[in-house]
């Protein structure tokens, strides 16, 4: 009798295959959890009623801010996915200047949707394709909602800047929005401008006074004081301004050397040579007609010594020393002077002109103002004031955000409602769009749409309102065709946000959605983390 046939061996999946799939899942989960933790950390600072964060640096310096990019930039983040969210806020800050908190909150909400979709077994590639599809539809909806704006319409520009400042510590000071608008309009041609170089707007911080004392100066402001050595002048009318990049002192040799003096007469000659040389340089400066001298800071030694300051004071030349190298280009563009690197090149054609250069006292020292420039360049200076360093730093950041908002309007001349109105409208229209699709893609697009409701939900939550009832009412309003209905956190109700003058540049919303979606898709496609050697 023959033996029974052996059963075919059952092939089991190898342990390595199982481990690989589990590893991919763990890596994605780790990335999503880390990124969402960062988004949740700054979510409470969204909107006009959002909270501020106090950050203490390793050297015990205190920073108070509710600007998303500033907060994340100063946090010590270790997880690579968390760092990606910090870079996301930075990218939004560079592109639009505002919406840095919103972009992180949206990214966090989208990652939450991704987590739920992956738990249902949907492949990351399908989710990525669906999210890109939903993004394109979202951008179409945002563009259709927008209202064109002219750069000559100053009122609309001020409304946009005010909306940006509403969520800041300085929101109660109404003059900052006007200053931001006037500063941008001063450095561009409204008829032809397509961008703004914010380097043409210089922010000078000076302690003392209140934020209301912040002013726009059509000219130059120097944080340095005029030199008072030997009673030099502190006020010059009909100023002719020179800018030097060399030292007004005895020249130094390029190598070490020794001078051997054999008698007293030679020693006396050596000692007298230095004052003679410096006096000759000062007279050359006076001969050119210069009566205000700006001296670039030197890292090797003092750019001007007491002797040269004494001679310049006797020649009635006002001296401002320690001008930073980074400020040279701005100064030259403003007053039309040219930097001079050698005393022999110091001639009248290199000088700039101004009606008045004077030293002005403030509660925290003195500054020098240059006003009445006959042919000013397209530059302005904003003198920021504040009662303490924390307030002053936050005022500077807030003003920078307002300037960036106006720059966004110069780049893309369209306004859109705020208060969560665009997000709810996009959510509803993308949900309707998902019904025209089939299969898993439809499901993923709908999840994308629902994730966008996080913005109005968070605005309501931070304002102390009931978020679920507010978002439900908002959906009903938009379903009835009221596309500009949004959350008015001041009144604690839903109103027509456009009529309430709560507006923002279209570029802020489109940039936030695009960057958030791109970051989520990028995180979604990571299946392993390796450490480089």
UniProtKB/Swiss-Prot annotation:
Its main location: cytoplasm. Coiled coil: none annotated. Disulfide bonds: none annotated. CDD domains: TCP1_delta. One of its GO terms (biological process) is protein folding. Residues 1-26 are annotated as: Disordered. Pfam families: Cpn60_TCP1 (PF00118). It is found in: Cytoplasm. GO terms for molecular function: ATP binding; ATP hydrolysis activity; ATP-dependent protein folding chaperone; unfolded protein binding. GO terms for cellular component: chaperonin-containing T-complex. The keyword ATP-binding applies. Keywords: ATP-binding, Chaperone, Cytoplasm, Nucleotide-binding. Molecular chaperone; assists the folding of proteins upon ATP hydrolysis. Known to play a role, in vitro, in the folding of actin and tubulin. Belongs to the TCP-1 chaperonin family. PANTHER family: CHAPERONIN (PTHR11353). This is T-complex protein 1 subunit delta. The gene is cct4.
